[in-house]
Amino acid sequence: MICRVGLAAALALVAVGGAAGPASSAAPIGSGVYTVRVDPRLCPSPLCGGYWVAFANGARTTCADGRRRPRCYVAKAVDEERHPLEVAVPDLGLARADLESWDFEGVGRLGVLAVTVVFTPAGSAPVSGGYYRVVDTGVRCVRTPCFSFRVTQVNGSTRTTTSGVDLRASGALAGEIARAQAALHTKNGLIAQGRFARTPDGGRLFRATRLYLRAPQPRA
């Protein structure tokens, strides 16, 4: 329910397409990882100026209206409590999130991205390959190749191991690579986009073309 403090406030809310909130009560979110593009269109909000999102590694995404499309428009991004994010999700970034359908006064129902984690892209190399979560398992071998990295497809169950990870291939800055290396040793690992290659010693290398670094998630 929207609380109106006065006629002027109500009119202002309608003018900007005030959102009444999700159709159901706030529930745990973050079931998938989505690619995010900032909407560059200049028509009035909330019909423009939000984000275009797609299910990472998916050919089509189920949008807020239930239809499956290559990508979906969302009017805005909110946090787990459905408060507006204080800072925008970066263009070409990733978000662990869910798509919800909200009612916007005077407009109708539009998609909203409910976000738990934002990932900022890092790197300047041409992007290719799928999205993967990479974890250093801590296994150390006497002989090479040593398949010590676990690589899992984002939004999927396909899993493999590699004997090496090339982060520098992404063209990221030294500080960004250092953060990515630290993420490899965490429980959640590092999300990266890239491809696999064989090595001369019989090993397998994951060559990252883009790194995604976990960002703070401030809210208003």
Placement of each model-derived feature along the sequence:
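C-terminal region of N-terminal signal peptides and the immediate post-cleavage residues
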Residues: V16-P28
